[in-house]
Amino acid sequence: MKPIFCFILACNTFIAAFSQDFHITLSGGATNYSGDLQVKRYTFDQSHPAIALGLAYGLNEKLYIRSQVMLGKLSAHDKFNPLTAMRNLNFTSSLTEVNVAAEYYLRDMSEYAVSPYLFAGMAAYHFNPYTNDTTGTKYFLQPLSTEGQGFYQDRQPYKLTQFAIPFGGGVKLALGENIRVGIEFGIRKLFTDYFDDVSTTYIDPNLLLANRGPKTLELAYRGSELKNGLPYQTGENRGSAKFKDWYYFTGITTSIRLGNRNGSRIKSRSRLGCPTKI
C-alpha cells in the first residue's frame, strides 16, 4: 500500500510541477486567402470567422513550443475583381488545421508587461473546395477535374490534405502572472496552387465533356452564365501556376497558465511576481 501511495504522490508532484509551464491558448479572428480568385496580398474582403484552441509549453520566459487546432472557412468570387469578373468562378472551403510551432518573445514577459513575438513551425491542413451551380446545388470541385486532372497531359489530382509552413508574429500583454492577451497575424505558405481549384489553362471542352461530363464543363468556366459572357479558348489561362496559394489568420489570442506560477519551474529561471515594466 505504501509503495502505491508514494507512486501516486510522485505522479501528482510531477504533473503539478510541469503543468505550471503549460498554457491553454484560445484564439478567435478571421481567415482569408490569396490566390487566383483573390489577388490582394492582404485584405479583410471575403474573410470568414475562425477559431483555434491549443496548448503551449514554456521552455523559458522567452521561448515556447505550441500546438493548435484551427477551424475556419475560406472563399472567393471573381465578381469582386473587375479583372477576372468575366471568368465568373468562385469557391468555398472549410479549413481544418493542426500546427506545431516555436514562439519566441523579444522581451522577457516575467519582467515586461508587453512583448512582441515571432513564431514559425509546421502544419497539416484539410480543405475541400466547392461551388454551387445556377440552381443552388453544391458540387465539390476536386472530383470534377475542372482542368483535366487525372486524364490530361501530366496534370494530377490534387490532395485535399497537405502540409504548410505557418509563420508570423504578434504582440502580447500580461494581465498578471497567469493570463496573457494579444493580437496575432499568421501566414500559411502552401505547396499547392489548387486551394481554389484554379491553376493552369482551359483544356478542350470536348475532351472535358467526354471524360468528366456536362457538369464539369459547366463549372470549369462560368463566364457563359453572364449576360455578355464570351466562350473561352483552349489553352487560354484559367489561372496562374507561377505562384502558389496562401491563407492567413488575423485575430485575438488569449493564454492561461495551468496552475499557479508560484512554485513553477519557470520561477527558478526568472523573477517572481507580476511584470513591472512596460
Please provide the spans of the model-predicted regions.
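Outer-membrane beta-barrel proteins
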Residues: 33-39, 75-80, 126-132, 191-196, ...
